[in-house]
């Protein structure tokens, strides 16, 4: 049985598992032993080698497959497809446009060269006309997008409705907490100003030592909202003005009955000063002075 198989007429070989030290000239020198090499397309760790005769390509594949080259065991086999980006199509496969048309399904031309109809308005996924693949309802990408769009409003609405009351409550609580100390301070200041101790403390010690001022009638006079003097203080002020205690004043003011002869002795015994200051000279206990 012959070794050579010319069913596809392929002249392009795939060379894999190349070493990082391998260069294009090294591959060209190795494969040129089996025939004329037309092109060497070197990649990172693999390459494509093209021969001028399919039989030379088959010989190179047979002898070089699994051989150690440049420190690595390479694999050599026929390539499975037409070359990309090459301009010489004489021995590399079918020319451009020789593939299968997506519009009519016939081999030998592309969809842009198809004369069966408007190929731009046909979907390549479902085969129906009137829309393109991007707008196809059967596209898996569109199904995913539609599912995500249908779910997104539900997800976005639920947390907003639940979070809005809590945010308003938290803001109101924060405002109330920040304002509460100020209100307490204002109330404390008002209570202090209303208390009598605040008025007493505002008076200077010099004003406290001063004796109360008397008006024209002899009664103590209130100055600048100061509290009225106690009955004991009024008694002491009256005694100082008369020049002695209430008892001494009563004794010194008594007039002899000889002077008041011809009149009522009970009325003449009292001095005019005693009549004026009789209410003020009453003791706190309610007993009258002699």
UniProtKB/Swiss-Prot annotation:
- Where the record annotates domain RRM, the positions are 11-81
| Amino acid composition bias (Basic and acidic residues), ranges on this chain | 187-213, 233-243
**Entry's family note:** Belongs to the splicing factor SR family. RS2Z subfamily.
For this entry, the protein name equals Serine/arginine-rich splicing factor RS2Z33
Q: Which UniProt keywords apply?
A: Metal-binding, mRNA processing, mRNA splicing, Nucleus, Phosphoprotein, Repeat, Spliceosome, Zinc, Zinc-finger
Segments forming CCHC-type zinc fingers: 99-116, 121-138
- For the modification Phosphoserine, the affected residues are 164, 166, 180, 202, 204, 211, 219, 226, 230, 239, 245, 256, 271, 283, 287
Q: InterPro entries of this UniProt entry?
A: Nucleotide-bd_a/b_plait_sf (IPR012677), RBD_domain_sf (IPR035979), RRM_dom (IPR000504), Znf_CCHC (IPR001878), Znf_CCHC_sf (IPR036875)
Subunit text: Component of the spliceosome. Interacts with SNRNP35, CDKG1, cyp59, SR33, SR34, RSZ21, RSZ22, SCL28, SCL30, SCL30A, SCL33 and SC35. Interacts with MOS14.
Where are the residues of the annotated region Disordered? 135-290
Task: List, in alphabetical order, the GO biological process terms annotated in this UniProt record.
Answer: mRNA splicing, via spliceosome; RNA splicing; spliceosomal complex assembly
What task does this protein carry out?
A: Splicing factor involved in constitutive and/or alternative splicing. Regulates the splicing of its own pre-mRNA and the alternative splicing of RS30, RS31 and RS34. Associates the cyclin-dependent kinase G1 (CDKG1) with the spliceosome and recruits it to U1 snRNP to facilitate splicing.
Whether Plastid counts among this entry's keywords is no
